[in-house]
Amino acid sequence: IHLPNIEYAIKRNLSRFNYLMQEGYAVILPIYLSTYERIDDLKSDYPNESEEYKDHVIKWGKDYKRAIDYIVSRDDMDASNLTYHGASWGGFMANTLLAIDDRVTSAVLYVGGLCFQKSKKEVEAYHYTSRVTMPVLMLNGKFDQFFPLESAQIPMFKLMGTPENDKRHYISETGHFVPRETLIKEHLAWLRKYETN
């Protein structure tokens, strides 16, 4: 189940998931509020203290849970191996989403972290991070300008409630990206490591 960065949330481009589909994995792209044809008046995906932002986080959580409900209802999908993949905004939202539903069994977070911007307490991401307990792989750039290593990536990694031996923080000598070859190699290895069947 995927939550994209906001740039990709406007246009669909499934080719970036070819490496997963070629290995037999299903890729689920829920149509979250404010993405694809559900674009609305939300001014920014950055956290803020408005009621509008709080309401959006709650609705994104509902969209996420509905997507999981759908996967679980299907006989042709293995819901026991459900993995979350979040990219940028999706890596940040993982702080909240992974904490609100325990049916996801592992996660790969691509260039995510905690944000500096404050939001209402009910949806403040760091309040949820310690409730993330499944295996998590974080793939980040050392020089990321959106999620800096020392102030966004490392705090998120340390706050997660995942046992130390089930979480990994891969740091590339890059900015707000990790080379595609690295993403593919690390992502597939993580999926294989935590498959239950």
State what each model feature region is:
Residues 145-152:
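Conserved alpha/beta-hydrolase "acid-adjacent" motif
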Residues 91-102:
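Short glycine-enriched nucleophile-adjacent loop
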Residues 162-197:
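C-terminal catalytic histidine-bearing segment of alpha/beta-hydrolase fold enzymes
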Residues 1-62, 119:
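Cap/lid segment of the alpha/beta-hydrolase catalytic domain
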Residues 103-114:
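A conserved short beta-strand
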Residues 44-88:
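Gly/Ser-rich "nucleophile elbow"/oxyanion-hole loop immediately N-terminal to the catalytic nucleophile
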Residues 92-93, 118-127, 152-157:
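Alpha-helical scaffolding within the catalytic cores
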Residues 132, 138-140, 144:
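Short beta-strand/loop motif that positions the catalytic acidic residue
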